[in-house]
Amino acid sequence: MSMDSSEMTTDLTAALEPLAATPVLLVALDFDGTLAPLIDEPMAARALPASKEAIASLAALPDTVVAFVSGRMLADLRVIGEHRDDSPIYLAGSHGAEFWYPTGAAANHVHGGDTDTDDVDADALRADADLIVADIEGAWIEHKALGFALHSRMSTAEDAARATREIDALVVERAPGWRRRTGQDILEFSSSHAGKDVAIAALREETGATAVFFAGDDVTDEDAIAHLSDGDLGVRVGPGESSARLRVADAQELAGVLSTLARMRAARRE
């Protein structure tokens, strides 16, 4: 059951204590709306200073792995995450279809999810999607490695509905096997059927994590939250239906939770 902010504050220490004590902890975090506020220009998104500080503290601890798990394609996630080649932070892009590990090798493939690419000219499909939204004010198409996304954050409700109808019709006709996802002012289609649950499972196996902390703010994050194990902890950032055990109001409040987790885990290792 989700909790409101007051309940979360009361029970925070109790919720974090098992994670602070676990032998190997994976801290997996969505990026947009979770570490960084949602903004109109997606490539300008950056994690809040408090988020960066908490992440650095966690990543510096022994037996503690930090990962960004995002719907962004891997290349874009590295840009907004200010991610260098020597970074200790793991990445899962495209909802778990692309990976980057600290060895520096990008695992640019679907990790456990099916794909549907037969008879689909993805480049032509993206180009036609661009044409559809060209005369719809505020709507635009984000090209992704395994598909595309319709953004309507800056559109009126009427224009957003029109763009959604026309893009849906295009994909039904041309790529009916592609996975459809909805989020906050976004409609995404992908040839990969992988979800963030797949990403968490892959990262858990890769890192040998004995417990997982996962936080996210959108519908696609619920794939991961719903598949967490009993010893894990899911946190929902902001409003919306969720199966997360805890809820925080926004990215700033989550940064405080991450900082608390870092302090508690560091104390366990003194």
Name each model feature, range by range.
Residues 2-9, 22, 112, 197-270:
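Mg2+-dependent phosphoryl-transfer enzymes with acidic/Ser/Thr/Gly-rich catalytic loops
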Residues 1-31, 35-39, 50, 82, ...:
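Non-catalytic pre-domain segments flanking phosphatase-related domains
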Residues 34, 74, 220:
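Conserved Rossmann-like nucleotide-cofactor binding loop
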Residues 136, 142-213, 219-228, 232, ...:
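Conserved acidic, metal-coordinating active-site core of Asp-based
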Residues 46-141:
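Active-site phosphate-binding/coordination module
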Residues 29-32, 95-96, 151-153:
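Short loop/turn segments at strand-loop or loop-helix junctions that form parts
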